[in-house]
Design a protein with these regions (language model features):
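Conserved alpha/beta enzyme-core scaffold
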Residues: 1-154
Length: 154
């Protein structure tokens, strides 16, 4: 950000540490907040443009056919990354489980991938949590979190 490589952000959440820095006006473009679910639609419609997408894939072959079903970091569907892969100018698949070519039941196919990077581990599953999925500790946030359970089901 300080070097001008990142000039704007589109997100559904910002952690407090980076939020404090961003609130000082260090980005030349405004931050766009949107719901988690509307992100793929905005990408596919061309409203949100992606220069480069880094897709963490639990398994990939050397050409970029990748899946979330295999490997030590298996997580299930990579569906949330479809829009990124389809619309980004460049796509980098990062994996910790390189499989033989071709990975035939890929979620994202090589047609959309420019580069594949094999790393020792794509992440620590225990550390993958955001402020939106972490249980709140303060009384007001707990009260807000509890409220939806009080709504009648029709």
């Amino acid at each position: 950000i300080r070097n001008g490589v990142v000039t704007g952000l589109e997100t559904d959440y910002i952690a407090p540490g980076i939020g404090r820095e961003l609130s000082k006006g260090i980005l030349p473009k405004p931050i766009i907040f949107r719901t988690h679910g509307s992100r793929p639609a905005d990408i596919l419609s061309g409203h949100s443009l992606i220069d480069i997408a880094f897709i963490a894939a639990p398994a990939s072959d050397s050409m970029g056919n990748c899946s979330g079903k295999y490997g030590p970091s298996a997580c299930g569907s990579l569906g949330y990354a479809f829009a990124d892969a389809m619309k980004a100018k460049k796509v980098v698949v990062i994996t910790d489980h390189l499989m033989d070519y071709p990975l035939t039941d890929a979620s994202i196919t090589e047609d959309y991938v420019d580069y594949v990077v094999n790393v020792p581990a794509i992440g620590d599953p225990l550390g993958i949590v955001s402020g939106t999925t972490r249980m709140p500790k303060d009384p007001i946030a707990l009260k807000i979190a509890h409220r939806p359970s009080m709504l009648p089901v029709c």
